[in-house]
Each structure stands twice: as C-alpha cells, then as structure tokens.
Amino acid sequence: MKKIGLFGGTFDPIHNGHLHIARAFADEIGLDAVVFLPAGGPYHKDAASASAADRLAMVELATAEDARFAVSDCDIVREGATYTFDTVQIFRQQFPSAQLWWLMGSDSLMKLHTWKKWQMLVRETNIAVAMRQGDSLHQTPRELHAWLGNALQDGSIRILSAPMHNASSTEIRRAGVSDGIPPAAARYIREHGLYEK
C-alpha cells in the first residue's frame, strides 16, 4: 500500500527546518512521497508576507532535490478559506487506496479539536506529530484525551522522534535571508526582492 505524507504550511518562507522535519517524516513513517501544500489563505494564521505564487515557487525550488518530495497548489487555487479536512478529501479521491499521513507540529495538535470536522479528519488520515521543544502530550486538551489514547494504541498517530526545528519563518523574515533558507529559495528571495525591510 502506498504511503503519502501531507505537509501543509504557510512556508513564508520555506526554511531548512521544514526540509529537515519532512525528511524525518518520510524516514520514520516509511513514506513513498511527502506532498508540500503551501497555504492559500491560512485559516489559523495571520496573512502571509509573500504572495501565494512566490511561496509556491520557493517551495518548488527548495524541494526539487529530494525525489520523495512533491508540491501541490490545491490549497492555493481553492476559493475562500482552506481547511485541512477538505485538503485530505482531495487526496483521498486522488489516491483511494493509499495510506495518508498528515504532519503537524505539537502546537497544532493542542488545537486540533478547534479544526473544522476534526473528528472526521482523524478517520480519513493518520497523524504524525513533530514535538516542539517544551511541549508534552500531557498538555493535550481534555477534548482530545479519549481520541489520543485510542490513536496512540492503534498507531493512527505517531510522535516523530525528530523534534520540530527551532527556526521559524517569522524569525527568518525579521532577521533577513540567512543560512536557514535552502540556497535555491534564498536566491529566489533575493532576485524578487522579497522580505525587504
């Protein structure tokens, strides 16, 4: 059975931490592919600094060297707010017999119960969690306790041994383009004058 990982994010800009966790996701779960999904209008985050087209281009450039990585614009081309459940449904239709895995950080796991159709989402896809420094499953909200206990037992949620990278896109934007960005994406940023103060 084919295993496909889905990695959604604003990627504003994509950085080496994203690539590191995507590789760990692929390795630890045994994925055939990791599909990067740049957000169009992210529901749970503030507006992006770079346009959707620029963020898509940077992700395509940054992921080109790993044959396991693919990029989809499905969250960009959809009208209105994009929700994870709807994105997973698109991939479920494209790959009906595949095992789908959604990658999220532990910060997102703590808010999962606020996501649209979250209970249906966790029936449609497995969840891989990259823990952020200082986070613990003991901090999980009460609304998720029963589901989390069952999911840990049946293997439909996996906690990755690779921690989430400390770098954030916000910090990288504030500091300016640095070593934390893949060279092809850094070149694109310079050539297009993105994130200039």
Swiss-Prot record:
InterPro entries with a match to the protein in the record: Cyt_trans-like, NadD/NMNAT, Rossmann-like_a/b/a_fold
GO biological process: NAD biosynthetic process
Catalytic activity: nicotinate beta-D-ribonucleotide + ATP + H(+) = deamido-NAD(+) + diphosphate
Pfam families: CTP_transf_like
Pathway stated in the Swiss-Prot or TrEMBL entry: Cofactor biosynthesis; NAD(+) biosynthesis; deamido-NAD(+) from nicotinate D-ribonucleotide: step 1/1
EC id: 2.7.7.18
Leader sequence residues: none
GO molecular function terms listed in the Swiss-Prot or TrEMBL record: ATP binding; nicotinate-nucleotide adenylyltransferase activity
Gene3D superfamilies: HUPs
Keywords, comma-separated and alphabetical: ATP-binding, NAD, Nucleotide-binding, Nucleotidyltransferase, Pyridine nucleotide biosynthesis, Transferase
Cross-referenced HAMAP family: NaMN_adenylyltr
NCBIfam families: cyt_tran_rel (TIGR00125), nicotinate (nicotinamide) nucleotide adenylyltransferase (TIGR00482), PRK00071.1-3 (NF000840)
Similarity field: Belongs to the NadD family.
Job description of the protein: Catalyzes the reversible adenylation of nicotinate mononucleotide (NaMN) to nicotinic acid adenine dinucleotide (NaAD).
Protein name per the record: Probable nicotinate-nucleotide adenylyltransferase
Species, as recorded: Neisseria meningitidis serogroup C (strain 053442)
Source organism phylogeny: Bacteria, Pseudomonadati, Pseudomonadota, Betaproteobacteria, Neisseriales
